[in-house]
């Protein structure tokens, strides 16, 4: 019973923290496909988009797959595109997790 109560308190705290924020901060792992740019445009691009209201992509770790040459070549271009939408590029997944609420 004590464990359940502790879990309930922790989850309640998490939910209240998210509701207190202006928006839920989203992170992306991997800027090696066009999907990452498309999702960033959808969520960050149109302020009046009801689908994305309350959400914002704020950070991205660019490397999904460094070993697939065709994917790795696209990363620099996709970095520029998401930076134009206000996304911060981070150097590690650990750093990304410190900046976001969900990935």
Spell out what each predicted region is.
Residues 20-103:
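N-terminal glycine-/serine-/threonine-rich beta1-alpha1-beta2 phosphate-ribose binding loop
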Residues 1-22:
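Bacterial Sec-dependent N-terminal signal peptides
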């Amino acid at each position: 019973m004590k464990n359940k109560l502790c879990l309930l308190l922790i989850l309640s705290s998490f939910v209240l923290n998210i509701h207190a924020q202006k928006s839920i901060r989203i992170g992306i792992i991997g800027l090696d496909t066009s999907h990452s740019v498309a999702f960033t445009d959808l969520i960050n691009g149109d302020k009046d988009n009801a689908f994305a209201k309350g959400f914002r992509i704020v950070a991205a770790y660019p490397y999904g797959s460094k070993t697939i040459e065709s994917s790795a070549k696209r990363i620099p271009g996709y970095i520029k595109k998401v930076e134009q939408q206000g996304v911060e590029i981070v150097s590690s997944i650990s750093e990304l997790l410190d900046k976001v609420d969900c990935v």
